[in-house]
């Protein structure tokens, strides 16, 4: 499917048939036209899931744009970057904490359509998306398919990243169905 914004790789609406919930990678190079498009489509609540260091070093222009409400609510759980492919699901499960409750509540109770994002729109954004879709009553299959769309959208970027950073194991950073399935098994009833 690709990104609905030209300056991002992984911005897309959740499969709800509208723009109520839009997940994204870092929207750091938005054009004036894209900002207008977001505003015209009522996507005016912005939730930044990045940790403090990312937030400070790579600001998002939407924080200062008139007509937008900006919330910096970093995903706090999950710990360090996983050291093995098997540890990715555990990292995801660690994200489900009180801060995650606040994030989900802010997104689901927003008065406008919401765009939420992290760096790549993959891990933190993927867990948030899975929880939102689960709360909305979507099947595990729909949730997994949404998560796996990130793999399609980011594959070229991830391969290039590993080429530039050979110490990174591509099997850790590529989205895998079993990782989000573990999250869904941990939150069967919300």
Predicted regions and their residues:
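Ser/Thr-glycine-rich phosphate-binding loops at phosphate-binding pockets of nucleotides
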Residues: 120, 124-125
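Cys-dependent protein tyrosine phosphatase-like superfamily
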Residues: 1-115, 127-190
